[in-house]
Amino acid sequence: MKETIAFIGVGRMGANMARRLKDKGYTVTAVYDSHAPLATALAAEIGAEACKTLARATELASLIITVVTDDKAMRAIFAEQGDSLLVGAKGKLFVNCATVSPQVHLDVEALAHKSGAESLEACMASSITQAREGTL
């Protein structure tokens, strides 16, 4: 089965990572951003769905890549109540690329595990050019 990918957080880094994977033949099915116009524009460009909820992004992908700004944003997308990436997460893989505190990564890993999902820490170094070129 071919992996389907969702991106959560499609600012400059997330959007360029999504573009790169799409250009390389990967199936990017969903994008989500707290600033909806970013997701809408990128979705139109790469042929993905601009999700209105985090749960919808989880539903549409087997691999969910998160590229959010900080601890608060990471905790919000992995909330235990309400709209969350954890809704329907059983069997999914989260790859968390945000640079957040070690405790947040541990907390997210525990929440994912509790939901039947897996979570990997994949912090990045470099910038937008490297994201677009695939050299992070």
Regions found by a protein language model. Give the residues of each.
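Short helix-capping segments at alpha-helix termini
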Residues: 25, 86-90, 113-117
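NAD(P)+-binding Rossmann beta1-loop-alpha1 motif at the extreme N-terminus of oxidoreductases
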Residues: 1-67, 92-93, 131
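Fold-independent oxyanion-binding glycine-rich loops
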Residues: 34, 54, 97-98, 122-124
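Short gly/ser/thr-rich secondary-structure transition/capping motifs
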Residues: 45-51, 75-79, 117-122
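Short glycine-/acidic-enriched loop or helix-start segments at secondary-structure transitions
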Residues: 14-17, 75-77, 104-107, 131
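Rossmann-like NAD(P)-binding element
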Residues: 51-105
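Rossmann-fold dinucleotide-binding core
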Residues: 5, 99-136
